[in-house]
């Protein structure tokens, strides 16, 4: 009889395994994108990179969630495996320490799964759901062990704090900001791109991704250095949000027609700009693609200025800025290949 591990591995085999070179682990584009194939993004000067442990971590983390999360059907299992949440984490944080990347994969995976749950809830129900999880994440309240979202979050945060309490605790509040943004009623009344980008900086979890990257890389920046990164992070949030919105638009537009009228409400840069500019959806996506490349140029310019400044730049700050670049390039690579959007 097969062991549970072998059963999980067999179930996951068609969807999760990647081949990657030992020295340069780049993710293969094994999925032909079906989302807006007539729209070609402008060329980018950046290259993506993937964490070298992507295959083993993906198998480990997917196996954990297959064993512990209550998926309602095999179709839901397949959808989960196709999404490759650990892969996107390894693309976001390719420079993460080997003994920390699995923490980041588990956290982003459970947050993605919770986000899917919220699509079928009203804002009030979603807010109550998240408010229950926040004190559990802090360790102030013990979880109900019959509810996967509760014990998974509790055990994960406890293990992260045991590994590095200082940097783990820096991830907590940004995570809560992200969770609150998911049920923010403001998303129902956003009609201007600038307003949308301000909201999306919280909803895309930019502060969460930044803090989680510092945890996963073991980076300790001074308070002054963190403050000095605000403009760079805000620029990064715009690029991340819009690239994600371009690729996820078709999936989210469909969800808005089939999910809860609040939880699945379509709030996207594509929709906002199309309505504001009176352009069609394909034209709006082309305009947004040009904007993303301009934000990449802005990132490079800010980084060059910081490195050339008379005050200099610490090695930790340089690593952090390079990490932000990899977040953006990695997000684009995952967004254009994941079956979650394509």
Curated annotation (Swiss-Prot):
Keywords: Lyase, Magnesium, Metal-binding. CDD domains: Terpene_cyclase_nonplant_C1. The record marks 92, 112, 178, 334 as: Important for catalytic activity. GO terms for biological process: isoprenoid biosynthetic process. It comes from the Eukaryota. Pathway: Sesquiterpene biosynthesis; aristolochene biosynthesis; aristolochene from farnesyl diphosphate: step 1/1. Its cofactor is Mg(2+). Changing residue 244 to L: Abolishes catalytic activity. Disruption phenotype: Reduces the production of PR-toxin and leads to a large increase in mycophenolic acid production. PANTHER family: BETA-PINACENE SYNTHASE-RELATED (PTHR35201:SF4), TERPENE SYNTHASE (PTHR35201). Homodimer. This is Aristolochene synthase. The gene is prx2.
